[in-house]
Amino acid sequence: MSMQITIAPRRAFASKELWEMHTLRAKVFRGRLGWEVPVLSGMEIDGYDALEPRYMLMRDGETLRGCWRLLPTEGPYMLKDSFPQLLDGQEPPSDPHIWELSRFALETEGAGGYGFSEMTMESIEAIIRHAHERGLSRYVTVTTTAIERMLRRAGVVTTRIGSPQAVGIETAVALYVEIEPTWEALFARRLAS
């Protein structure tokens, strides 16, 4: 499968594309995962979406298959402002070379390599390439411990910021995603295949 992946500021996307993204997020977060997130008119939208984030949208033809949100850590972001307990008392990152990844949503597809679908692996490669090309050193993200294990198996180099804690119905953990080591690992894996 070859997807069209676009990473751009919110204002670069058409209203229909944003509607599709927020609808997909509602379907995944409230519908499939059972998270307590605000859903308005069938769309999952939060205050961080008003901060001019960048989004990654993944399309297979005309169909939106997945998305990711990217926010700089110099302003408000989820780990710092919604899940500070996951920092274990540490100062939240505030650095132009560290951005937060959040709101990863994907249409379900069968698992492929390392427990992730081919589409997920493509999106990971694209988000790491984006950071590498922009000179970012790390992403910060909040995820589940199950996804953390899958990321590591897939070659994503992560560092825990704090200890795992219960957040809603999940066991969550805050992670740094180390860009250069991950870039090298993914590139080496690509050469080996």
List where the protein language model places each region:
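Short, charge-rich binding segments
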Residues: 47-50, 57-63, 89-95
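Short amphipathic alpha-helix that is part of the acyltransferase structural core
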Residues: 1-47, 55-57, 64
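Acyl-donor binding region in acyl/amide transferases
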Residues: 78, 84-172, 181
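C-terminal helix-cap and adjacent tail motif
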Residues: 173, 177-193
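Short beta-strand micro-motifs in enzyme catalytic cores
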Residues: 52-56, 97, 171-175
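Short acidic (Asp/Glu) patches
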Residues: 39-45, 49-52, 77-89
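Short, His- and charge-rich active-site/binding loops that engage polyanionic ligands
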Residues: 61-91
